[in-house]
Regions:
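Thiamine diphosphate
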Residues: 1-130, 135, 152, 369, ...
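Anionic-ligand anchoring segments at beta-strand to alpha-helix junctions in alpha/beta enzyme folds, i.e.
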Residues: 22-58, 272-298, 417-481, 485
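Short acidic, glycine/serine/threonine-rich loops at helix termini
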Residues: 34-39, 68-70, 91-95, 116-122, ...
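Conformationally flexible catalytic loops at phosphate/diphosphate-handling active centers
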Residues: 50-54, 165-260
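Conserved thiamine diphosphate
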Residues: 121-171, 348-363, 533
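Phosphate/diphosphate-binding loops
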Residues: 326-348, 352-388, 478-492, 498
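ADP-ribose/adenylate-binding Rossmann-like module
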Residues: 501-523
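Conserved small/polar residues in nucleotide/adenosyl-binding loops
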Residues: 534-543
Length: 551
């Protein structure tokens, strides 16, 4: 293995490239960079495990890409695709066929919200939850490192089990977050690949030399029985996924499980979640457990098929309160999907804990340690609110939890936090991407970069969030405590609270064309007061005159 700095999309694309012979693509935000990366590698002659460049097929829509995925798999080629949101919805008819015919295709999905009352390009789990009934295996990653590792596991297990996989991770929050990770090399995974299963897959392919009949119409006399005959494949699937998790664990030294437990062994309150929120919850648990709490987290990796036995084994027997967090909304349902699975796991069992559920993070709404605290405060009430929302103020139906008090920075103590305010297309985001990759590649620092911006291609507000630390960074939320803040557009001084959250010894850099005299007049009083508060006590005029005018 080698260390490399990349985002979640690149990690998933690299994992898929090893095992893919044909890639059927159609671009859609935020999954497009995966197809772009595969296209670039194939064009430069990069080889997969079979010693050939990937054959890329770009179709007219996601429906065409799904049809190509289906047909290519029927023809005996290991095929992948990359999509999200409405694109995944267009693939549903083919997913039923692919799963029903036991074809080992893999879809890598940067999970994104669906267009309902409005369209949003940002991340949640609405699209993935819309395909859970198709029979496709759903495997969740919560970080850039997991995108690499579980991306490989999805392909390894798909071929071995003859089952199609959707490997999904949070759009933007994970797909576009840059981290330094361990990259699995070809020699690391070649020996793990089930080459016999590949040969059997090719033998079952449609071939005029040994014709078979598929895709028939069946009548009531046999359809039910044949549909039920697929059950053994799903019953054995969890063990297959864990088998390859164990093999990846041996190579990497990590500990992947179908349901990973993190926290106090005798926890009385346990969170259940999947995706990038798990990193936030882990960081919050570390902070709170050192202060006397007994908290834990069960991170769901294998969501479908949901293995109740493996899930219950992961939850400590000491748990008295369970909080299930879903990053989706299913209007009219008795509860959100993960919540219902967890409730069902304890149905009819004696001594079941109190189980409540809620929603968070729709359309990439930031999920912070303060939100974890709000959820914790709620579950400890005498009558906790069920079906709650967190991170927003719901003044219509009153489902939102009251905001918790802000807690100190839960990131590593040595973590340096930097924010850059920029203007879409001014180069701030691109420069920061280059800088963080250089620092990650040429120093021993762990790095994290996330870029907050709206749907406009250019001309909008951008805020770059960069973190640097000697230890791995799990802070999958926007920076609230900054050591360094730079503003690259002087107009922002009147439009935004630029210095909100700056540390006492923080640095503020303003890129502007004003002279020292103009600076004293142009800067808003609030910004000046903040600068005075965090500098040595001196006359205001003197402070103004010392402030830099450009960068």
């Amino acid at each position: 293995m080698r260390k490399e700095t990349m985002d979640g999309n690149t990690a998933a694309a690299l994992a898929s490239y090893y095992f893919t012979e044909v890639a059927a693509i159609y671009p859609i935000t935020p999954s497009s960079p995966m197809a772009e990366a595969v296209d670039k590698w194939a064009a430069t002659g990069r080889k997969n495990l079979f010693g050939q460049p990937v054959k890329l097929v770009e179709m007219q829509s996601e429906a065409g890409a799904a049809g190509t995925l289906h047909g290519s798999l029927q023809g005996g080629a290991l095929t992948s695709t990359y999509t999200s949101s409405q694109g995944l919805l267009l693939m549903i008819p083919n997913l039923y066929k692919i799963a029903g015919e036991l074809l080992p295709g893999v879809l890598h999905v940067s999970a994104r919200s669906l267009a309902s009352n409005a369209l949003s390009i940002f991340g949640d789990h609405q699209d993935v939850m819309s395909v859970r009934q198709t029979g496709v295996v759903l495997l969740s990653s919560g970080s850039v490192q997991e995108c690499m590792d579980l991306g490989c596991i999805s392909h390894l297990a798909a071929v071995h089990s003859r089952m199609p996989f959707i490997h999904f991770f949070d759009g933007f929050r994970t797909s576009h977050e840059i981290q330094k990770i361990d990259v699995l090399e070809e020699e690391d995974i070649r020996e793990l690949f089930d080459w016999d299963a590949v040969e059997q897959f090719r033998t079952r392919a449609l071939n005029p030399e040994h014709p078979v009949l598929r895709g028939t119409t069946q009548n009531p006399d046999i359809f039910f029985q044949i549909r039920e005959s697929v059950n053994p494949f799903y019953e054995g699937l969890p063990d297959t996924v864990q088998l390859y998790m164990d093999k990846i664990n041996e190579i990497t030294g990590r500990n992947y499980r179908l349901f990973n437990y993190y926290g106090a062994p005798d926890a009385d309150t346990v969170f259940i979640a999947m995706g990038s929120s798990c990193e936030v919850i882990k960081e919050s648990i570390d902070y709170l457990n050192t202060r006397g709490e007994k908290l834990g987290l069960v991170q769901v990796h294998l969501f479908r098929p949901f293995s109740t036995d493996h899930f219950l084994q992961a939850v400590p027997a000491s748990a008295k309160r369970i909080v299930v967090l879903d990053r989706t909304k299913e209007p009219g349902a008795a509860g959100e999907p993960l919540y219902l699975d967890v409730r069902n796991a304890w149905f009819g069992r004696k001594g079941a804990p109190v189980i409540i559920g809620g929603r968070y993070g729709l359309a990439s709404k930031d999920f912070r340690p303060e939100d974890v605290m709000a959820v914790l405060d709620n579950v400890r009430r005498k009558e906790p609110k069920n079906g709650f929302t967190v991170g927003i103020t719901d003044d219509v139906t009153g489902l939102s939890l009251p905001a918790a008090e802000k807690i100190p920075d839960t990131a590593p103590a040595d973590c340096v936090n930097c924010k850059f305010w920029g203007f879409g297309s001014d180069g701030t985001v691109s420069a920061n991407k280059s800088a963080v990759k250089i620092i990650g590649s040429h120093t021993d620092q762990y790095v994290q970069a996330y870029f907050a911006y709206d749907s406009k291609k250019s001309g909008g507000l951008t805020v770059s969030h960069l973190r640097f630390s000697k230890t791995p960074i799990r802070s999958s939320y926007l920076i609230n405590h900054a050591d360094y803040i730079a503003c690259h557009n002087q107009a922002y001084v009147d439009s935004f609270h630029l210095l909100e959250g700056i540390r006492e010894d923080g640095i503020f850099l303003l890129n502007c064309i004003w002279t020292d005299e103009e600076l004293a007049e142009k800067l808003p009083e609030e910004l000046i007061e903040t600068c005075l508060l965090y500098t040595s006590p001196s006359p205001r005029d003197r402070t103004r005159s010392r402030m830099p005018s450009s960068a």
